[in-house]
C-alpha cells in the first residue's frame, strides 16, 4: 500500500490535534538528608514558608527553614520510607485542616484526620492553620460570661466570652479537671468546645473522651489529640489546628471555647523542632521566637463584632457577634511562675487561675489560690447576681489569709478578728467542689447569699458542705420558683432577696443538716 506524503502529514496533524496531553508546572527538588523527622531538600526554588511539601508515600512536610541552597522541612507522620535522593514537590498550599459541624463529637489528629474509628468526617470546608488574628476595629468588648460551673472561678476569677484565661500550676494540681468541668458546663448553652491534648499519654486522652461522653458533653466538643507518641511536629501544630476549628464557629457568629492542654509541651516540641533545624538557641535553649509562638495563637481568641461576622459570611449572618474563648494550660516546675514560658503566657493572657499543690494536698479542690488568681476583663462579663454576692467571698478569703498568718503569733484575739477568721474558714470549706458536678447560676447565688449573710456562721466547718447540699435540696423541692427567677433573670432584686431570706431562715429552723 502506497501512502503519499500529503496523507502522512494529514495523519500526523490529526494525531497532534487529538492528543490529550496535559502539562503541569511544579517545582520539585531532591531530598539531601532525612534525620529525626527533619528533611533537607535541594532544588525547591519558589517555596513559601509554611508550605506543604509532598514526599513519596503520600507523606507531607511543612517548610520551616528557607536557606540559600536548601529547604529544611518537618515531616508530618512516619518517615521510615523516605530516603536520600527521593523527589519532593511543592504543592503551592499552606497547611490546612477540615472545619465544620461534622467534627463535633469526633477525635482527630493534628491534621484533622479521624483517629476514633468512627469513619470519615463530613467537613464543611478547609481552612489554613495559621491565620491573622482579628484587628482592633473588628473586635468587641467582652461582656458575656462563660459559666464554668465552679464556685471558686465564677465568683472570684470570672471568665468572659472572648477572653484568654490561663490555668497554671504544677503537675497533679487539677488543671485538666478545671478545664473539663468548664467544657461539661457548656452543655445546652450553644457554646462549642475544642479540647486540644498536646504531648499527653494516649490513655489520659481516652479517659477525658470517656468522661465527656458520660456527661453528654462530647456532642458539642471536638478533641484534637497529639499524644506523647506522635512526632514533635504534630505536637507543635496541634494547637493551631484546634484554633482554626474554633475560629470557624467564631466567624459565623457563634461562641466557642478552646482548651490547650498544655502549651508547655507545645513549647518543648517547638524547641525540639527548632534545634533539629539548627536554629540558634536562646534562654532555656528555646528559639528566639517562642513568645511569638504563643502570642500569635492566643491573639486569635477574641470576641468579634457583627460587621466582621457579616463580612466573613458574605451577608448570610447579620447582627450576631462571635467569640472564641481560650483556656491555655501551663505546667510549672515546683511552683516557679518566673520561668520563661510561664511568664510569656501570663503576659499574653487576660488573667490566670493559679492552682497550688499545698491547697490540693490539703483537700481544697479545685486548689485555686485566690490571692494570685486574677481575671483582668471577666468582671465586666460576670452575671449580675454572682458579681453582687461574689465580692464578699473574695474579700473574706483575702482577709482570712492575712489574719490566719497573724493569728499564729497572737495569743488572744478580739471578737471582730475571731469572727473574720471563722467566716474565712467556712468560705474556704465552701469553695470545695467535687469534680464533674458543675453548679447553675441560681445554685451558686444561693450558696454565696447564705455565706455572705452569716447563715453559715454557726454551722461547724466540717458540716458546711452537708449544709450547702441540704439547703440546695430544700430550695429545689419547696422554693423552685425563686430559683427559676434567679436563673432566668441573672439578678437578685429586692423582692426576690426578701423571699430568699425568708426561705433560708425557714430552712435554718428545720435543722435537717
UniProtKB/Swiss-Prot annotation:
InterPro entries: ATP_synth_asu-like_sf, ATP_synth_asu_C, ATP_synth_asu_C_sf, ATP_synth_F1_a_nt-bd_dom, ATP_synth_F1_asu, ATPase_a/bsu_AS, ATPase_F1/V1/A1_a/bsu_N, ATPase_F1/V1/A1_a/bsu_N_sf. Its EC number is 7.1.2.2. It comes from the Bacteria. GO terms for molecular function: ADP binding; ATP binding; proton-transporting ATP synthase activity, rotational mechanism. It catalyses: ATP + H2O + 4 H(+)(in) = ADP + phosphate + 5 H(+)(out). ATP binds at residues 169-176. Gene3D superfamilies: 2.40.30.20, ATP synthase alpha/beta chain, C-terminal domain, P-loop containing nucleotide triphosphate hydrolases. The keyword Nucleotide-binding applies. It is an enzyme of class 7 (translocase). Produces ATP from ADP in the presence of a proton gradient across the membrane. The alpha chain is a regulatory subunit. This is ATP synthase subunit alpha. It comes from Thiobacillus denitrificans (strain ATCC 25259 / T1). The gene is atpA.
Amino acid at each position: 500500500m502506497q501512502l503519499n506524503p500529503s496523507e502522512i502529514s494529514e495523519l500526523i496533524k490529526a494525531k497532534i490535534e487529538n492528543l490529550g496531553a496535559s502539562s503541569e508546572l511544579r517545582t520539585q527538588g531532591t531530598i539531601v538528608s532525612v534525620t529525626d523527622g527533619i528533611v533537607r531538600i535541594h532544588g525547591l526554588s519558589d517555596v513559601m514558608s509554611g508550605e506543604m511539601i509532598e514526599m513519596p508515600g503520600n507523606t507531607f512536610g511543612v517548610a520551616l527553614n528557607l536557606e540559600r541552597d536548601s529547604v529544611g522541612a518537618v515531616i508530618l507522620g512516619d518517615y521510615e520510607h523516605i530516603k536520600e535522593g527521593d523527589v519532593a514537590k511543592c504543592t503551592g498550599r499552606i497547611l490546612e485542616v477540615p472545619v465544620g459541624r461534622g467534627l463535633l463529637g469526633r477525635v482527630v489528629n493534628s491534621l484533622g484526620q479521624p483517629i476514633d474509628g468512627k469513619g470519615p468526617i463530613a467537613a464543611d470546608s478547609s481552612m489554613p492553620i495559621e491565620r491573622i488574628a482579628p484587628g482592633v476595629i473588628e473586635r468587641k468588648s467582652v461582656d458575656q460570661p462563660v459559666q464554668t460551673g465552679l464556685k471558686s472561678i465564677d465568683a472570684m476569677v470570672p471568665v468572659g466570652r472572648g477572653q484568654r484565661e490561663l490555668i497554671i500550676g504544677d503537675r497533679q494540681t487539677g488543671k485538666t479537671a478545671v478545664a473539663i468541668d468548664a467544657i461539661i458546663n457548656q452543655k445546652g448553652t450553644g457554646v462549642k468546645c475544642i479540647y486540644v491534648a498536646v504531648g499527653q499519654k494516649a490513655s489520659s486522652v481516652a479517659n477525658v473522651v470517656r468522661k465527656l461522653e458520660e456527661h453528654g458533653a462530647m456532642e458539642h466538643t471536638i478533641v484534637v489529640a497529639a499524644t506523647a507518641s506522635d512526632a514533635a511536629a504534630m505536637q507543635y501544630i496541634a494547637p493551631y489546628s484546634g484554633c482554626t476549628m474554633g475560629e470557624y464557629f467564631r466567624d459565623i457568629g457563634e461562641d466557642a471555647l478552646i482548651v490547650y492542654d498544655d502549651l508547655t509541651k507545645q513549647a518543648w516540641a517547638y524547641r525540639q523542632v527548632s534545634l533539629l533545624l539548627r536554629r540558634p538557641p536562646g534562654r532555656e535553649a528555646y528559639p528566639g521566637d517562642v513568645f511569638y509562638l504563643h502570642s500569635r495563637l492566643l491573639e486569635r481568641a477574641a470576641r468579634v463584632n457583627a460587621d466582621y461576622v457579616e463580612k466573613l459570611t458574605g451577608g448570610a449572618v447579620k447582627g450576631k457577634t462571635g467569640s472564641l474563648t481560650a483556656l491555655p494550660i501551663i505546667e510549672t516546675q515546683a511552683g516557679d511562675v518566673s520561668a520563661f514560658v510561664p511568664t510569656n503566657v501570663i503576659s499574653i493572657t487576660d488573667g490566670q487561675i493559679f492552682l497550688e499543690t499545698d491547697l490540693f494536698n490539703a483537700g481544697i479542690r479545685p486548689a485555686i489560690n485566690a490571692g494570685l488568681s486574677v481575671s483582668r476583663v471577666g468582671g465586666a462579663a460576670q452575671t449580675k447576681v454572682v458579681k453582687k454576692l461574689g465580692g464578699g467571698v473574695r474579700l473574706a478569703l483575702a482577709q482570712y489569709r492575712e489574719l490566719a498568718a497573724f493569728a499564729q503569733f497572737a495569743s488572744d484575739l478580739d471578737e471582730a478578728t475571731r469572727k473574720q477568721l471563722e467566716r474565712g474558714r467556712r468560705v474556704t470549706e465552701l469553695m470545695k467542689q467535687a469534680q464533674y458536678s458543675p453548679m447553675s447560676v441560681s445554685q451558686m447565688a444561693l450558696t454565696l447569699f447564705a455565706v455572705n449573710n452569716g447563715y453559715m456562721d454557726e454551722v461547724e466547718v466540717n458540716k458546711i458542705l452537708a449544709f450547702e447540699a441540704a439547703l440546695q435540696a430544700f430550695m429545689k423541692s419547696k422554693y423552685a420558683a425563686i430559683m427559676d427567677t434567679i436563673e432566668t433573670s441573672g439578678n437578685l432584686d429586692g423582692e426576690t432577696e426578701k423571699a430568699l431570706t425568708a426561705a433560708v431562715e425557714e430552712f435554718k429552723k428545720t435543722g435537717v443538716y
